[in-house]
Amino acid sequence: MARNLDPKCRQCRREGEKLFLKAEKCFTDKCAIERRAYAPGQHGQRSGQRMSGYGVQLREKQKIRRLYGVLEAQFRKVYAEAERRRGQTGENLLQLLEGRLDSVVYRMGFGGSRAESRQLVRHNGILVNGKRVNIPSYVVRPGDVVELTEGSRGQLRVKAALEAAASRGFPEWLDVDAKAGKGTFKAYPQRAELPPTINEGLVVELYSR
């Protein structure tokens, strides 16, 4: 199965902001962005040249792809579905990305990062409405109950991720019972509930060319 093998800290430095790809490390002063807040590579500290409009749009698309851990072909499919839905395409895009099972598992705190959450899903560690689902791109619907299997509940990494997430608080669109390792996807998030650093309008402009 294809996946992005670029070092995670390098991806964050390329985008110039934290993408929270390495679990708890991203919340400490060991984060690469805290120590080297410039692009990777030989000329990283001198890469301040202005980008074209197309370059800015492409950079934003790459950032969103990396943030959600989605490959190009998958991203295009999600975008096509966002276009078909009623409402604003950009907001639809973010809602669909947040509705992926790996994203929901991450937001519920079952994994410390989306990569960890994706692995948990693939290894049959997650139930949706009482049934095992091992497809990270599975679309979670409002009202669906997502929970850890009995086996995954006892994993130290999962316990640590849940404790850290509970201390930070959970998103409003989720109802999470951290002790039970279970949560309900109440609704798709509103745009105001998602990171303001994302500019989905640039992606819409890019694909409208």
From Swiss-Prot:
Domain of life: Bacteria
Record key words, sorted: Ribonucleoprotein, Ribosomal protein, RNA-binding, rRNA-binding
Keyword Protein biosynthesis: no
CDD domains for this protein: S4
Oligomer and partners: Part of the 30S ribosomal subunit. Contacts protein S5. The interaction surface between S4 and S5 is involved in control of translational fidelity.
PANTHER family per UniProt: 30S 40S RIBOSOMAL PROTEIN, SMALL RIBOSOMAL SUBUNIT PROTEIN US4M
NCBIfam families linked to this entry: PRK05327.1 (NF003717), rpsD_bact (TIGR01017)
Protein name per Swiss-Prot or TrEMBL: Small ribosomal subunit protein uS4
Species this chain originates from: Aromatoleum aromaticum (strain DSM 19018 / LMG 30748 / EbN1) (Azoarcus sp. (strain EbN1))
Upper lineage: Bacteria, Pseudomonadati, Pseudomonadota, Betaproteobacteria, Rhodocyclales
